[in-house]
């Protein structure tokens, strides 16, 4: 990529229909893990006008009220009025869970290459990424896209902008100069709203109360603001679009700044490497950058179903590494256990922590639940590299 360019990332709020689905799926997962931490869960959700469908595969000893979990999640998000697109009190909830296939279970429970360790729940490839564009070691565009819709939710909930409704989207286009963020070129923010507010009022409030308090002032240089560019956004949420689990995988990760292996996260227990190995790859990449070994780090891992050890662990630093990428990859394999069971133990993943991850990004959030955001291995990596 050239050193001078524009790059765009987007995010969506907790009230976006796909994120409603993600949060219900992860709320189901959390409720099960709270009772049965070794459960096998693949919980999918569809939500439309007045309807929620729960399907997938679950094998557990837990006793869970799935219908109530779906309603409680919709209520927490803020859909408590039929005018908003769905109402937690009146929506229909259909439950259609099966058990995990025994053919899959036998490979997960006992790895073909390591009797003592859990095999991967499926084949697949996963990526982790980190860079020094923000203190959280995330790409600038996706980090601030998340913060914009997060603030929209805050102002909706605390009543400062009472005409806001739960559904919203943001998009941030950043101008890079010499490969580094220089300024914000364009901000798009679309927010669902009550019908009794004018476009002019929405535009002024969004720019002054949401955008400017979030984005660094020094980055706002001739920035273009596109606020509700269609002119009206009253119909939203699951009424405006059908929501499905796993349809916001770029929002969930790095906003397009890194490749994606294709596997979604929400609703999946940690035996699914789509989720756990992607978290581990972020953990690795963040520690590499935090150690000073590179300014950018992309990590790819891949697995075969029923096999514990990753097929490959590949590191790419885009020319920013202090030592060769192959040497960094060797250090990674020495300092991180990337077998599925090793990942679960390393990151303490058998906890009911996942509903919080299902909106505003799985990465770049330094909260206690996000163990994969720790940089506790940076010093050891730096020492091992001789820096």
Swiss-Prot record:
Cofactor: Mg(2+); K(+)
UniProt subunit comment: Homotetramer; dimer of dimers.
Localisation: Cytoplasm
Binding positions (K(+)): 44
GO CC, any one term: cytoplasm
Role noted for this protein: Catalyzes the formation of S-adenosylmethionine (AdoMet) from methionine and ATP. The overall synthetic reaction is composed of two sequential steps, AdoMet formation and the subsequent tripolyphosphate hydrolysis which occurs prior to release of AdoMet from the enzyme.
EC number: 2.5.1.6
Binding locations of ATP: 16, 167-169, 232-233, 241, 247-248, 264, 268
Pathway(s) of this molecule: Amino-acid biosynthesis; S-adenosyl-L-methionine biosynthesis; S-adenosyl-L-methionine from L-methionine: step 1/1
Protein name: S-adenosylmethionine synthase
Binding site for L-methionine: 57, 100, 241, 272
Family: Belongs to the AdoMet synthase family.
GO terms under biological process: one-carbon metabolic process; S-adenosylmethionine biosynthetic process
SUPFAM superfamilies: S-adenosylmethionine synthetase (SSF55973)
Organism ancestry: Bacteria, Pseudomonadati, Pseudomonadota, Betaproteobacteria, Burkholderiales
Gene: metK
Species annotation: Cupriavidus necator (strain ATCC 17699 / DSM 428 / KCTC 22496 / NCIMB 10442 / H16 / Stanier 337) (Ralstonia eutropha)
């Amino acid at each position: 990529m050239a050193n001078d360019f524009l790059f765009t990332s987007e995010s969506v709020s907790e009230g976006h229909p796909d994120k409603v689905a993600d949060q219900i799926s992860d709320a189901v997962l959390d409720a099960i893990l709270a009772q049965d931490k070794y459960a096998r869960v693949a919980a999918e959700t569809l939500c439309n006008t007045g309807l929620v469908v729960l399907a997938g595969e679950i094998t557990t000893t837990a006793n869970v009220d799935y219908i109530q979990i779906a309603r409680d999640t919709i209520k927490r998000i803020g859909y408590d009025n039929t005018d908003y697109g769905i109402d937690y009190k009146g929506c229909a909830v259909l439950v259609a869970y099966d058990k995990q296939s025994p053919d899959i279970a036998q490979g997960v429970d006992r790895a073909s290459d390591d009797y003592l360790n859990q095999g991967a729940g499926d084949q697949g490839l996963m990526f982790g990424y980190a860079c020094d564009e923000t203190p959280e070691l995330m790409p600038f565009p996706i980090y601030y896209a998340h913060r914009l819709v997060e603030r929209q939710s805050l102002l909706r909930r605390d009543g400062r902008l009472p005409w806001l409704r739960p559904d919203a989207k943001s998009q941030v286009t950043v101008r890079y100069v010499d490969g580094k963020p220089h300024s914000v070129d364009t901000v798009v923010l679309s927010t669902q709203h009550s019908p009794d507010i004018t476009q002019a009022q929405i535009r002024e409030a969004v720019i002054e109360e949401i955008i400017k308090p979030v984005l660094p002032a020094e980055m706002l240089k001739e920035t273009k603001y596109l606020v509700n560019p269609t002119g009206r956004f009253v119909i939203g949420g699951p009424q405006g679009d059908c929501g499905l689990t796993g349809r916001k995988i770029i929002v969930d990760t790095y906003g397009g700044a890194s490749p994606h292996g294709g596997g979604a996260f929400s609703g999946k227990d940690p035996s699914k490497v789509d989720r756990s190995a992607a978290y581990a790859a972020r953990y690795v990449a963040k520690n590499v950058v935090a150690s000073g070994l590179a300014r950018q780090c992309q990590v790819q891992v891949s697995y075969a179903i029923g096999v514990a050890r990753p097929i490959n662990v590949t590191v790419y630093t885009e020319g920013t590494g202090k030592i060769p990428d192959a040497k960094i990859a060797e250090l990674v394999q020495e300092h991180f256990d990337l077998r599925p069971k090793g990942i679960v133990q390393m990151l303490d993943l058998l906890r009911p922590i996942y509903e919080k991850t299902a909106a505003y990004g799985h990465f770049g959030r330094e909260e206690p639940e996000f163990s994969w955001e720790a940089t506790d291995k940076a010093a050891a990596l730096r020492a091992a590299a001789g820096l």
